[in-house]
């Protein structure tokens, strides 16, 4: 069977390391699908879910808050400041953080505050969408 080695790493820990048949993730300009022997590629990724179809046919979901992707013919590496396993996502916390970001946008006094709040809101919205996608696949 043709597989590709996949590593998903956050600033704190290795989230996933193993063999996969396919990886789908949110590239900066659209969804990327990676199969074994893919052409080498380096790209930024945006907040969203990484779907890994493991060698045994099961799926692993990981939320990433953006980061970098490196693809080699036999290896995929995803580097993200924040990465959370699908099973560890907490909808209540994500919704609370989304509301806090919306409030911060309303109360922003500078362009920097507004940009920070807007970025946080986008990440929380992506996290909630990733959680819903994970639950649908379960």
From Swiss-Prot:
Keywords: ATP synthesis, Cell inner membrane, Cell membrane, CF(1), Hydrogen ion transport, Ion transport, Membrane, Transport. It is found in: Cell inner membrane. This is ATP synthase epsilon chain. Produces ATP from ADP in the presence of a proton gradient across the membrane. InterPro entries: ATP_F1_dsu/esu_C_sf, ATP_synth_F1_dsu/esu, ATP_synth_F1_dsu/esu_N, ATP_synth_F1_esu_C, ATPsynth_dsu/esu_N. It comes from the Bacteria. HAMAP family: ATP_synth_epsil_bac. The gene is atpC. One of its GO terms (molecular function) is ATP binding. F-type ATPases have 2 components, CF(1) - the catalytic core - and CF(0) - the membrane proton channel. CF(1) has five subunits: alpha(3), beta(3), gamma(1), delta(1), epsilon(1). CF(0) has three main subunits: a, b and c. It is a peripheral membrane protein. Its main location: membrane. One of its GO terms (cellular component) is proton-transporting ATP synthase complex. It comes from Albidiferax ferrireducens (strain ATCC BAA-621 / DSM 15236 / T118). Belongs to the ATPase epsilon chain family. Gene3D superfamilies: ATP synthase delta/epsilon subunit, C-terminal domain (1.20.5.440), F0F1 ATP synthase delta/epsilon subunit, N-terminal (2.60.15.10). It holds the Pfam family ATP-synt_DE.
């Amino acid at each position: 069977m043709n597989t590709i080695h996949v590593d998903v790493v956050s600033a704190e820990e290795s989230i996933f390391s193993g063999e996969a048949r396919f990886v789908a993730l949110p590239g900066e300009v659209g969804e990327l699908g990676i199969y074994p022997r893919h052409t080498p590629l380096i790209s930024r990724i945006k907040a969203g879910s990484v779907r890994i179809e493991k060698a045994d046919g099961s799926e692993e979901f990981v939320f990433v808050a953006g980061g970098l992707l490196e693809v080699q013919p036999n290896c995929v590496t995803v580097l993200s400041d924040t990465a959370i396993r699908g099973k560890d996502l907490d909808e209540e916390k994500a919704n609370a953080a989304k509301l806090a970001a919306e409030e911060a946008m309303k109360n922003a006094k500078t362009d920097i505050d507004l940009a920070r709040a807007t970025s946080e809101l986008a990440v929380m919205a992506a996290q909630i969408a990733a959680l819903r996608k994970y639950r649908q696949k379960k």
